[in-house]
Amino acid sequence: MSEVLSLEEKKKRIAELNKSFSKKYGESGMVRMGTEVMKVEPISTGILGLDLALGKPMPRGRAVSISGTESSCKTTTALTTIATEMKNNKEAFCYYADVEQALDTDYAESLGVDLSRLVVDSTSVGEEALTKLRDSIASGLYSIAVLDSTNAICASKQEESDITATEMAIRARLLATTYPQLINACGKTNTLLIVIEQIRKKVGVMFGNPESTTVGEAGKFFMTQRIMMRRQTKVEEEGGVAISNEVKCSVIKNKVAPPFRKCDLVCIYGKGFDKITDTANLAIDFDIVQDKGHSYKKGTPEEKKWKSKDEFIKYLSSNEDFYEEIRKATLEKYNNSDQTLIMQDDDDIDRKNAEKEKFEDLAVTSKDNSMISDGSDEFKEGE
């Protein structure tokens, strides 16, 4: 039978045990009770709607994956995050593993990325690219590291083999071996790793979601946050010229805030995400600006009115101080709100309300018929 210890005696023995670990293995990894707290420091994506959907923006020292269909602005999201970090931290350097060899540096610069502080590596051989990425993260010199993308990684065995040869899951096995090393390096150096993934459809799937990433299941478990991005519709000018995409972002995994939140964004070709429209939509959603049906209105401290949503957005874009005021008010309203209900689709909320009403109806019926008297009857889903 184990010895019964008092609280103070337990603290004393834990301190002695930690001291012995420190002597044997060094100070790395040990957290002292009541003296050190492992806090998660967020890095803003620079996209207000996505930051709010994430709850806490992308965390330093962790890995985040961005998956999605083609032209769903995955690379733009990563570059916008880099640009925001460089703007907020003038000493920040970032590393970009351009395995796809498709990075447009002019576009990156137009988004606000300082190319003099961006190191780009275009190695396509998997082992070499991942080794460089791991060592770059482990150096502690970079605030953000990006892998774009896992699907473009070509293992040396594939590169040397005949073009008709097939090797099952070679990329997935390579990444499954590398991910623990990358995550360990991120944690030690407080570096954010952004992994960009493409999605494919499984053959022969009759039920459930046929979509999957092509790098196996291992990566999903190492990610602190997973973002799924889908292109919805393209916006056209008069004459049928496409000028932007509407993109839906879904947070399908989140270890630092509630998951399954969503947001809708607009990405303008050649310019990046439309932050003005994003902020305007959020201000209306949070009732900072009231939708009166025939007009839009903001009350205190100074009343303002606009005849249409487009007029409100145009006013925001031409008044930087007012834009910052609206943005701060939206953030404040978000921080003081019930965050479990916001950033969800109306369909999600309607579905949950319907399920709640159905359960309440069942409970009332059961009570009227005296079917539930001692709790012995279990409610089974589907009955």
Positions of PLM-derived features:
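N-terminal cationic and glycine-rich segments that engage phosphates or anionic surfaces
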Residues: 16-19, 34, 158, 201-206, ...
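Terminal-proximal interaction/regulatory segments of ATP-powered molecular machines
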Residues: 294-383
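The Walker A/P-loop phosphate-binding site
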Residues: 3, 7-117, 134-138
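Phosphate-binding/switch region of NTP-binding enzymes
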Residues: 136, 168-286
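Conserved P-loop NTPase "ATPase switch" module shared by AAA+ and STAND
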Residues: 141-159
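Short amphipathic alpha-helices and their capping/turn segments at secondary-structure boundaries
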Residues: 129-145, 182
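Loop/turn-to-beta-strand initiation segments
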Residues: 91-93, 141-144, 188-194
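Flexible beta-alpha connector loops of hexameric P-loop NTPases
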Residues: 6, 116-126, 158-174, 206-211, ...
